[in-house]
Amino acid sequence: MKWLTNYYSQWQTKQLLVEQAELLVLDLELTGLDPRQHEIVSVGWLPIKAGRIAVSKAQYHINKEVTALAQSPVYHGIDADTVAQGETMATILAELHRALTGKVLVCHNLPMDWGFLKAAMRKHHVTIRPKLLVDTLALEKRRILQQGYPLAQDALTLSACRARYGLPAQRSQHNALSDALATAELLLAQVQAISINGKCKVAELT
């Protein structure tokens, strides 16, 4: 009956207004796109509570166990010296477990980030179960198609999605935490856009 308990818990969460729910917005920096052969370089997250981004509760962690940075430093500025001062993936997952328990996980391109996290959890025998999963990329894709607009190439990048809501452009070099913040800002803009009489249920984000 565990599946039924989980289903009911998810249903309850979906009925909440976004401002009533606790969310955790997360981003990863990676060495590549395939969790079977590439690695998590860094993890950044911050909560949204009562409809506000809690920047003071933000966390940023670098994985000291990365074995091959490849071209990663070009994109996020993390080099071997920075990695050496990081933390083990097990430590990072333990921190994430504490931060994410009882919250809705939000990512931009959720299948990518959640896929890498699940691979890391399997490797380190850790289980983290968010209350619900929300993907700002999938939400934006749905909104564009519902409005009858064509889906242009690169229309769903984080930068392109932010631009549609008049949010400022990101710096050319950014990290997991700055991207998590950018995703949190995007989510709140999306919520405002789809709200009716200022109200939006979590179900409308999934």
Model-based region annotation:
Residues V134-A152:
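Short alpha-helix plus adjacent loop in nuclease-associated cores
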